[in-house]
From Swiss-Prot:
It comes from Staphylococcus aureus (strain NCTC 8325 / PS 47). Belongs to the UPF0161 family. Could be involved in insertion of integral membrane proteins into the membrane. Pfam families: YidD. InterPro entries: Membr_insert_effic_factor_YidD (IPR002696). Its main location: membrane. It is a peripheral membrane protein. Residues 62-85 are annotated as: Disordered. This is Putative membrane protein insertion efficiency factor. GO terms for cellular component: plasma membrane.
Amino acid sequence: MKKIFLAMIHFYQRFISPLTPPTCRFYPTCSEYTREAIQYHGAFKGLYLGIRRILKCHPLHKGGFDPVPLKKDKSASKHSHKHNH
């Protein structure tokens, strides 16, 4: 699935996006963000993050720098609670 999603984004970036005026309010662009999210988080979580990003890319949102979030380290959060007795 990951390869299919990435191929679709590549097709969009290469053949469709150049035909339309730039309208994305964010850096990286929504398509690039989705590509990075899929590569970093996998097909389904990456696609979910990309859809969330696209939904907030509208004139009422100020946009700006919005990188793909890093993975949460579950083991670090379990060990970060220190007990002092």
